[in-house]
Amino acid sequence: MKNSMLEAASLLLEKLLLISNFKIFSVCAPGGGTGKKHPYEINSFLRGDVLEVSRTHFTHYGIYLGDNRVAHLMPDILLALTSDKERTQKVVSNKRLLPGVICKVASIRVDTVEDFAYGADILVNHLDETLKKKSLLNEEVARRAEQQLGLTPYSLLWNNCEHFVTYCRYGSPISPQAEKFHETVKILIRDQRSCLASAVLGLVSIIYTGLASYMTLPAVCIPFCLWMMSG
């Protein structure tokens, strides 16, 4: 029962995070950058470096493999629709990205630096400073990334691009972005002033989706579950 409650709470958190990023996916170019050509100093990147590109409300990460290749985790609905590599290897568009997030379909793929960054400025190994963790040797980082290439389940909270690079770089998958969002939601739900807002949100969900039992129960119980798991 406890696991079911946590799964329901997890699902709500993911949907909230998805909604918060919906505008980003809708109005930005693929990957969230400007799409404009940007002169990248590829020769300054070392195999195994973590490349980081800032977005409006989130950050995207990848592992540099050398020879203008970056391994990164990307949601892509096309992976569930076809096995044609010629189609799936093309740069992931917004029309493929958002449905991929919703359906939790993704892959760890290799793109050029330009396609990965899509016009955004690149930071190199910035996570080393922000996380204050000792990194593995660059060659080991790159090997780990190469071993992960291929299909992977996607989760905004538990298996995103940041989890991928931190596993490769430090040996354990973590995502400060997801953790920060998770803590923020717990604080809001735990705050008594948010109880009414949570109830209204549940009521709106029921009205919008209908009174189907599979939606009614989560809409009523999830705010309570979140409060219970806030410890």
Swiss-Prot record:
Coiled-coil residue spans: none
Keywords (A to Z) from UniProt: Acyltransferase, Cytoplasm, Endoplasmic reticulum, Endosome, Lipid metabolism, Membrane, Sensory transduction, Transferase, Transmembrane, Transmembrane helix, Vision
GO terms for cellular component: endoplasmic reticulum; endoplasmic reticulum membrane; multivesicular body; perinuclear region of cytoplasm; rough endoplasmic reticulum
Record-annotated membrane-spanning stretches: 195-215
Domain of life (superkingdom): Eukaryota
Family: Belongs to the H-rev107 family.
Keyword Iron: no
Gene Ontology MF term list: O-acyltransferase activity; O-palmitoyltransferase activity; phosphatidylcholine-retinol O-acyltransferase activity; retinoic acid binding; retinol binding
Signal peptide location: none
Cytoplasmic side: 1-194
Regions of this protein lying in the Lumenal compartment: 216-231
InterPro entries in alphabetical order: LRAT, LRAT_dom
Predominant localisation class: endoplasmic reticulum
Species, as recorded: Rattus norvegicus (Rat)
Name this polypeptide is given: Lecithin retinol acyltransferase
EC nos: 2.3.1.135
Reactions catalysed: all-trans-retinol--[retinol-binding protein] + a 1,2-diacyl-sn-glycero-3-phosphocholine = apo--[retinol-binding protein] + an all-trans-retinyl ester + a 2-acyl-sn-glycero-3-phosphocholine; 1,2-dihexadecanoyl-sn-glycero-3-phosphocholine + all-trans-retinol = all-trans-retinyl hexadecanoate + 2-hexadecanoyl-sn-glycero-3-phosphocholine; 1,2-diheptanoyl-sn-glycero-3-phosphocholine + all-trans-retinol--[retinol-binding protein] = all-trans-retinyl heptanoate + 2-heptanoyl-sn-glycero-3-phosphocholine + apo--[retinol-binding protein]; 1,2-dioctanoyl-sn-glycero-3-phosphocholine + all-trans-retinol--[retinol-binding protein] = 2-octanoyl-sn-glycero-3-phosphocholine + all-trans-retinyl octanoate + apo--[retinol-binding protein]
Domain LRAT: 50-177
Pfam families: LRAT
PROSITE patterns: LRAT
Functional note: Transfers the acyl group from the sn-1 position of phosphatidylcholine to all-trans retinol, producing all-trans retinyl esters. Retinyl esters are storage forms of vitamin A. LRAT plays a critical role in vision. It provides the all-trans retinyl ester substrates for the isomerohydrolase which processes the esters into 11-cis-retinol in the retinal pigment epithelium; due to a membrane-associated alcohol dehydrogenase, 11 cis-retinol is oxidized and converted into 11-cis-retinaldehyde which is the chromophore for rhodopsin and the cone photopigments.
Record membrane topology: Single-pass membrane protein
GO biological process: cellular response to leukemia inhibitory factor; lipid storage; maintenance of location in cell; positive regulation of lipid transport; response to bacterium; response to retinoic acid; response to vitamin A; retinoid metabolic process
Residues forming the catalytic site: H60, H72, C161
